[in-house]
């Protein structure tokens, strides 16, 4: 199955819902001021964000679409091109090909976004690219989290460093990086406990993990990935804002895009923060984490290829 097919199938529910709603506005209508306002309102309701919605509305207005043409198709083409222009600079396929030296990756996010599963899937992609990968189980609050990461490590045959439940997460991360440097590893993926962005003590602990890794390598963590749940809608904006204040984020991964989530939130994030998008979670299977590609995302989102 090709990458477009995987994006298309993964996005089927959210893309179908989006285009269906848009079609209801446009069908059998000319693009007049009232229709443009309805399109803008619909885009905002679809989590695209106010700024992007206004820009798209302006482009549609300036295009002066011939009413004899397939208006829905013309609007979708405008959307597709807008998405590609906005998001192409945010592709970061190179993340999966870093092998020159150890890349310590801090993976964070609020509770329930699928961090541990995402780490397992990242690990599988990295290993398939020839990288030597280690997992570091720094979510020491939940025994289940350690067990889940260990299960992934066994499944894809990568090394894991762990400690007993209740151990200091920062020390676990430190030991992992130290061991990885000695063992010639390319990547250490550091799993952290889910934490609400408004809980100061938990966010301080998260910062401590990053600071401790710097004792081994001043540039560590080399990547800081925030995992987001697409079903959270506009809440993810606040999550990016708060996590980015503590430790600058180098990349985003959006999960749960295979359901009825409004994929438009990715446009809002791209417009506001311009952070690289590492990958998208399009299902529960091992291979359902797809490296982000702006063109394939745009094609799947608008259902145009």
Language-model regions: role of each:
Residues 50-52, 142, 258, 286:
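Short hydrophobic/aromatic residue motifs in ordered secondary structure
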Residues 1-19:
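N-terminal accessory targeting/assembly segments
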Residues 17-138, 145-166, 173-190:
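Primarily NTPase-proximal linker/entry elements flanking Walker-type ATP/GTP-binding cores
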Residues 11, 47-49, 110, 139, ...:
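Residue-level signature of catalytic and energy-coupling elements of molecular machines
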Residues 148, 169-183, 198-303:
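Conserved catalytic-core segment of NTP-binding enzymes
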